[in-house]
């Protein structure tokens, strides 16, 4: 779904904005998440499941980073460092494996096969999911910040999932670090001035794009 399409401008956006404005503030992340998944699912009905799977796995890994099992005080720091390092490695392997599979596997397989002169590695010809690079690196930045202690407390699942899948930047970026938007994800307020400024910027950007 393109931002300049009739479907987005006159169907999705009005319905989304209406729901977002009328629900209580504590439910707005649910609306944002649901709207973002619908936005992505219209263009990628199968790969929206991959996005959800990636979000669930990354959230589970980040929760493990902050898990504090019972242990003697003198061992807690050392165990925390080891646990966070292991969790970071697992998340990086998972995220970059998916990205490599969909984006670089065929190129690598074709190069190896060409050099070898035979079909050693199968070419999968997988369709590239929209925005996979952006949401993968966004989750990687989140995991790295958790490991480094930049993020001191993990958010709930819905704010995290909404942060990763937020439709305005899901398929075209930019990549945003969680600590830059944490306050707005968990405690933002709707102000008329901000809404007006947002509409002006959107209209200007749409005009430049069209």
Residue ranges of predicted features:
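Membrane-embedded transmembrane alpha-helical bundles that form the catalytic cores
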Residues: 1-210
